[in-house]
């Protein structure tokens, strides 16, 4: 946006989809209703500096227990956990946390950024739209204010699409998002707040109240589809 003299700084390592972060994010996002407790438990353990967690699967349906166990095993095989052990008789999964900062960051919210990034990239590619996409973009305004945007796309010949990702409390950030949208000079439909905490009705209500677009994991793809088709 040269008219507004806004400068964007990219870190290309953050959009490298050759690792397993994007696949893991997609699994967590698509099965979020089932995996939310696992994510919360891991986040809590990191915050409290606990080295491990136990997941008791005995009170779940066989299908759900199997899905969670399989996910944990897959995440372990891709080094998201340092150790994985399933105690079959007790139906307990024992997980030792990985100390690598990139993995901790992933569980603390990075997975949602990856999920939104991949969703946006997929929508653009499916429609053959040339666009630059990036995660964690530092944006410098003319007065040298620095802001970081979680996910941004610059579709050719169109205004930017910004997605801010919140896997926890987001209400205190609404005012910041409103100011940011105005400074970027983009339509409310193109400034998206993606949160795991809202159902469709709540997201629609907040979208009506504020000049922003609120979505959840289920409605993100649908909203992006309407933007990319436009």
Feature annotation, model-predicted:
Residues 1-230:
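Intrinsically disordered, low-complexity Ser/Thr/Pro/Gly-rich regulatory segments
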